[in-house]
Amino acid sequence: IVTKEIDDAHGTEYCQRFVEYIKNYQKKDLIAAAVQTDAKGDRSKRPHEQVDPDLYVRVVSKNKDGIIVRGAKEDITMASYCDELIVLPTRTLTAEEKQWAVAFAIPADWDKVHIINHASAPRERKFLKAPLNTHGSSDAMVVFDDTFIPWDRVFMCGEHEFGGRMALAFATSHRHSYCGCKPAVEDIIMGLIALTAEYYGVADKHHIREKLAHLAGIAELIYAAGIAAAVESTKASSGT
């Protein structure tokens, strides 16, 4: 969506690059992590106002072969066990912040990419079997240490006015997918609450029933919002 909008505005070739990237991605059946949240530093300051300019991932140089990027992204889910890292801006950007307007994709084991992992794992089950709760998960800090990115893997480079658009395009799609899974999670939570209330002998109490009804309403509204967003959606210039 956004690469096509950048191309329409600047005559670049980002969209076709991304299409070719996706073709290869699908052919090889790869898995990617979205690498978006920057370290940020002082939240009261913009990227160009930070004491350390590398608190947001930025382009430090470019040549005919590609770009060199530096900085870190935080709390990246599954970075340690994905095939590809797809890097996106994390916020809106101003004209002074062109060097931070960058998007690209690279293999997770790319040269000069450092993944500092934080792993978590569920405790061993002693009494009740829980097959779906036997696997842990991880998130990581991803550090780009003057990392070279070839042009065919660069999807934004300096087009600052599209930084926020690209950040929100990912976030909005992410939230829309959650409209399907989060109501289901809430159903499980409500079931646990209802069962607990029954064991405690308070399932018929008004304040318990009221809170369960409120949760049910929230779950249904989220699900309905997801359907409405899909039905009422419009096509972007890319055809998406």
Q: In which residue ranges do the predicted regions lie?
A:
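Gly/Pro-rich turn-and-neighbor structural signature
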Residues: T3-R70
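Alpha-helical scaffold segments in carbohydrate-active enzymes
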Residues: E20, N24-K27, I31, H176, ...
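A generic local secondary-structure boundary/capping motif
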Residues: Y21-K23, Y56-V59, K73-T77, R91-A95, ...
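Structural beta-strand/beta-sheet cores of well-ordered domains, especially the beta-sheet scaffolds
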Residues: L30-A32, D65, D83-L85, W100-F104, ...
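Conserved catalytic-core segments centered on acid/base and nucleophilic motifs
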Residues: V59-S61, D65-Y81, L85-L88, L132, ...
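A short core secondary-structure module
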Residues: A72, I76-R123
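Glycine-rich beta->alpha junctions and the first turn(s) of the following alpha-helix
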Residues: R125-A219
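C-terminal helix-coil-helix/basic helical segment that borders enzyme active sites and/or dimer interfaces
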Residues: Y223-T240
